[in-house]
């Protein structure tokens, strides 16, 4: 019986070690580049508002970029699980405005906010990073494609 227990320990111990290391690796926040080669290039100069809003090809590219870089914290299909802010709420106030001029100005502000946080990350009041910055990895096309995806999900959830 004693030998069986040692044998079991020799088998189960390394297995548990591998599983625990895998669990720790699950929280990987390494930015993954987004393939935007199918999109029209925007250029080096940052453009606001999002030039890809409503562009179906950009939405598809953004969906893949979102899945690989954002879903772990912000939720699958942009449906927040409560870990990080609900990105679909970014544009809700804008979409509720009656004036199209005010709505456009509000959406432009939301785009700037999204771009700045995406590129530079976010820290809490204690200086701890609560979101990594993707400025070293994401192109302008990637940022706007992901925002186009989030915008499309917002409209879809609102039934528009």
Short names for language-model regions:
Residues 2-12:
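Bacterial N-terminal signal peptides that target proteins for export
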Residues 12-18:
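Classic N-terminal secretory signal peptides
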Residues 20-22:
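N-terminal signal peptide c-region/cleavage motif recognized by signal peptidases
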Residues 25-32, 52, 81-90, 117-154, ...:
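Axial heme c-ligation environment in periplasmic c-type cytochrome domains
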Residues 31-65:
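Electrostatic cytochrome c docking/interface patches
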Residues 58, 66-72, 77, 91, ...:
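Short pre-active-site segment immediately N-terminal to redox-active cysteine/selenocysteine motifs
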Residues 59-63, 79-119, 137-138:
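Gly/Gly-Pro-rich "capping" loops immediately C-terminal to redox-active cysteine motifs
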Residues 73, 105-108, 146:
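Primarily secretory-pathway and cell-envelope proteins
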């Amino acid at each position: 019986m004693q030998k069986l227990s040692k044998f079991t320990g020799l088998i189960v111990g390394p297995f548990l070690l591998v599983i625990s290391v895998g669990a720790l690796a699950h929280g990987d926040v390494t930015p993954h580049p987004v393939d935007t080669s199918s999109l029209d290039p925007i250029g080096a100069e940052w453009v606001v508002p999002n030039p890809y809003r409503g562009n179906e090809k950009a939405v598809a590219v953004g969906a893949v970029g979102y899945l690989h870089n954002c879903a772990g914290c912000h939720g699958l299909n942009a449906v927040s699980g409560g870990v990080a802010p609900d990105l679909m709420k970014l544009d809700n106030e804008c979409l509720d405005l009656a004036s199209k001029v005010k709505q456009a100005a509000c959406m432009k502000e939301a785009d700037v906010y999204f771009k700045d946080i995406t590129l530079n990350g976010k820290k809490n009041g204690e200086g701890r990073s609560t979101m990594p910055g993707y400025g070293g990895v994401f192109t302008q096309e990637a940022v706007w494609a992901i925002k186009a995806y989030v915008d499309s999900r917002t409209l879809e959830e609102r039934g528009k």
